[in-house]
Regions:
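Acidic, Ser/Thr-rich peripheral helices and adjacent loops at domain boundaries
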Residues: 44-60
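Class I S-adenosylmethionine-dependent transferase superfamily signal
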Residues: 19-20
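Conserved beta-strand signature within the Rossmann-like core of class I S-adenosyl-L-methionine
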Residues: 24-48
């Protein structure tokens, strides 16, 4: 299953992913997704996307550790985590609140 830079726009992403897990795909790939590494005790942060003005779009930044743990709990292990260089994403405006945010591709494999 391939999520091409879209899961961050799903309002109920965990419910949707649980439906996907029931299908038991061998691999699940996420590309172009923003993850934060701070010690903020939240699964997600909601941010406003401003590069498509005049439209207003909100999306999730995912807590990297919690996202990986959610998949592990649901029977999937992370086999690859790589920086996505297709788009230059500037996260500087989130400092000092978020020190480390990355635009990543993640590949999970069924255990």
């Amino acid at each position: 299953v391939y999520f091409g830079s879209c899961i961050q726009y799903f309002k109920n992403y965990k419910s949707f992913l649980k439906i996907i897990f029931k299908k038991k795909p061998k691999y699940i790939l996420f590309s172009g997704t923003s993850f934060f590494y701070n010690s903020i005790n939240k699964d997600t942060l909601v941010v406003k996307q401003t590069n498509i003005l005049p439209s207003t779009v909100y999306l999730f930044f995912f807590n990297y550790k919690n996202f990986i743990n959610f998949f592990d709990h649901c029977g999937y292990k992370l086999v690859s985590s790589t920086k996505n260089d297709t788009t230059k994403v500037n996260y500087k405006n989130f400092k000092p609140y978020l020190q480390k945010v990355k635009y990543l591709d993640l590949l999970f494999k069924k255990k």
